[in-house]
Amino acid sequence: MGLVGVGSFARISVIDDDHAVREATKDLLRSLGYEAVTFESAEAFLNSGAFAETACILTDVQMPGMDGVALQTFLLSHGHSLPMIFITAFPDDDVKRKVLDAGAYGYLVKPFDESRLLHCIETAMAH
């Protein structure tokens, strides 16, 4: 469990404006056997071209500039249906329903439980 994708394509892009959250999440994902790359904003992710090498996106909901919901909308409108998992410190039932209805594999409230994140990732990677 947790090593799904080890030895295969398992790059997760972590997008969060909080440096500490990005680094802690990256370290956690790497300890679980995933390759993780981080971005401080949705714009930085899009400008990097990393979506072509990303198996799953783990993104904050609320960020300056383009937020996680807008990123999901942008990617879907441009034909990129990458698996996405949302994390937030400010839960909102309307936002949760919107992102899940649009295909997100999870909506986790910070601080989130490692096992819940792992379940979301494994579900996303299986599709």
Give the positions of each predicted feature.
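Two-component/phosphorelay signaling modules centered on CheY-like receiver
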Residues: H19-V37, A124
